[in-house]
C-alpha cells in the first residue's frame, strides 16, 4: 500500500492506494482519528451491484450504516439527486458526527461531497473511488452538481477526511471508463513533467497495464494534483492549471449532452485544442502529431464533430465558471511542465477554434 498526505490551508488528510485495501477500510478510517455515530454510503446502481453489499458488511463491523443509491451517470449530478440524498440523510437521522462515504467515480464523489458540504452546514465525508477518472476528482475538495446551462456551476470546496483507493476495484471497469480516467493522467503529465509524459506514452494499451504499473501511475497523478492543491486550495492561482483541456472539454460535454460523451474523451479533445493554441501562440515545442496519434491508438477522439458550430462552442466557453468579465482564462503550455493562464476574448476563441478545426478538417 502506498500512502500520500495532502495538506491544504483548511485540512490535512491521507490518500491510501493499494490492491485489496477495502478489506481494511475500518482500520484505515479509524486511523484518521475521527469518531462517527453513523455512516451514509452514497453510490450508484452500477457500483452498488458489485460492491454495495460488501461495503455495508465491512463498515457494519463498527458503525451503523445506511445506503442511498442513485442512477449511474453524469445525469445524477443534479438538483433532484442532491435533494434526494439530503432527504435520505434526514430520514436516517444523520447528525453532525455522521460521515458520508462516497463509493463510486467522479460523479458520486462530486455529488456526495456537495451533500456533505451542505448537510447541517457541513459534515465529514470519505472518498472511496472506484474509477480511474476519480483519481483526479477524489483529491482536492471540489464538490458540486451540474446545471442545464453548464457543468459544475453549483458546488463548494469541501475536503474529504481520507481517500481510500483500492486499485482492485478498477478491474471491473470497461475500456471506455479506463480511457476516460487515463485522460486526466495525461493532463497531469502535461502540466508536470516530460519524463512522466514519456513514461505514459510507452503504454500501447490500457489493457496491458499491470496492477503495480497502475498503482504507480495513479500515485504519480495524485502526487501532481496534491502538490498543486497544497499551494492553491481554492483555485486563485496555480490550481487553474489543472483545467488544461477543460474549457473546451466542458463545452463539449454540455453541448453533446452529459453522459453522451465521457468526461475523459471530452477533455482529450480539449487538450488537443489547447496544445494547438500553445504551439501557435507560445511556441510550444511538442511533437503534437505524435501525441495525437498515440491518443487515437488508445481510442480517444481528438477533434470535434462538424455538426456543431464554432459559435455554439464559444458561447459555452464564455459561460464557463472560469470566465471573467467576458473573457476566458485559458490554460496553455509554454512547454511540458510549464503551464500558464491566458485571457481570451470571444473573438479570440472563435478565431483559434476555427483555425484548429480547419487544420483538423472538421470546420
From Swiss-Prot:
Give the top-level enzyme category.
Answer: lyase
- The residues that hold NAD(+) are 72-77, 106-110, 130-131, 142, 151
Q: How is the cofactor bound?
A: Binds 1 divalent metal cation per subunit. Can use either Co(2+) or Zn(2+).
Q: Where does Zn(2+) bind?
A: 184, 246, 263
Quote the pathway field.
Metabolic intermediate biosynthesis; chorismate biosynthesis; chorismate from D-erythrose 4-phosphate and phosphoenolpyruvate: step 2/7
Per the entry, what this protein does is: Catalyzes the conversion of 3-deoxy-D-arabino-heptulosonate 7-phosphate (DAHP) to dehydroquinate (DHQ).
Instruction: List the GO terms this entry assigns under cellular component, sorted alphabetically.
Output: cytoplasm
Official protein name in the record: 3-dehydroquinate synthase
Q: Cite the InterPro entries for this sequence.
A: Dehydroquinate_synthase, DHQ_synth_AroB, DHQ_synth_fam, DHQS/DOIS_N, DHQS_C
Major localization listed first in the record, in broad terms: cytoplasm
> What GO molecular function terms would the record report?
3-dehydroquinate synthase activity; metal ion binding; nucleotide binding
Q: Where in the cell is it found?
A: Cytoplasm
Which EC number(s) does the record attach to this protein?
4.2.3.4
The protein's required cofactor(s) are namely:
Co(2+); Zn(2+); NAD(+)
Q: Which Gene3D superfamilies match?
A: 3.40.50.1970, Dehydroquinate synthase-like - alpha domain (1.20.1090.10)
Q: Which UniProt keywords are listed?
A: Amino-acid biosynthesis, Aromatic amino acid biosynthesis, Cobalt, Cytoplasm, Lyase, Metal-binding, NAD, Nucleotide-binding, Zinc
Q: Which residues form the signal peptide?
A: none
Q: Which SUPFAM superfamilies match?
A: Dehydroquinate synthase-like
Task: Give the reaction(s) catalysed.
Answer: 7-phospho-2-dehydro-3-deoxy-D-arabino-heptonate = 3-dehydroquinate + phosphate
The primary gene name is: aroB
A Gene Ontology biological process annotation?
chorismate biosynthetic process
Report the family membership: Belongs to the sugar phosphate cyclases superfamily. Dehydroquinate synthase family.
**Lyase among keywords:** yes
So which domain of life are we looking at?
A: Bacteria
